[in-house]
């Protein structure tokens, strides 16, 4: 996977996604400082990691380009649950994925997981995270 694209900093908005330190993150806040007499405007971007929940921030000129992850939102079925992984099968391609429970499953979804249910998962930068339960 590893799909990403470039976007100009001035086009970013809260709620969108960005790659900071190689980690896909959701933008929480953007503050733009006005340019000085000979400088360019700078943007401070605060974001939370999708997989680890860590808060990260960067400062870039508004004219700079940054990497933005391409997030593939898909539907799968839980095939098996082990103490440390969940095995899901994609409903379109029938591929099997082993997702680690610690980093690959949202906290509010962990107690709802059982074999045979349908889940929505996100795939980005070669990593998978189960986001929500769709139903039986």
From Swiss-Prot:
Keywords: Cytoplasm, Hypusine, Initiation factor, Protein biosynthesis. The modification Hypusine is found at residue 37. GO terms for biological process: positive regulation of translational elongation; positive regulation of translational termination. NCBIfam families: eIF_5A (TIGR00037), PRK03999.1 (NF003076). Functions by promoting the formation of the first peptide bond. Belongs to the eIF-5A family. This is Translation initiation factor 5A. It comes from Thermococcus gammatolerans (strain DSM 15229 / JCM 11827 / EJ3). The gene is eIF5A.
């Amino acid at each position: 996977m590893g799909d990403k694209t470039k976007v100009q900093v001035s086009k970013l908005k809260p709620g969108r996604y960005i790659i900071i330190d190689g980690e896909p993150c959701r933008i929480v806040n953007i503050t733009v400082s006005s340019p000085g007499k000979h400088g360019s405007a700078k943007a401070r971007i605060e974001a939370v990691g999708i997989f680890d929940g860590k808060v990260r921030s960067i400062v870039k000129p508004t004219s700079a380009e940054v990497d933005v992850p391409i997030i593939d939102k898909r539907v799968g079925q839980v095939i098996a649950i082990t103490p440390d992984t969940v095995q899901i099968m994609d409903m379109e391609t029938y591929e099997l994925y082993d997702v680690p429970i610690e980093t690959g499953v949202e906290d509010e979804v962990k107690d709802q997981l059982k074999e045979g249910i349908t889940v929505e998962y996100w795939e980005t930068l070669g990593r998978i995270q189960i986001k929500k339960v769709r139903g039986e």
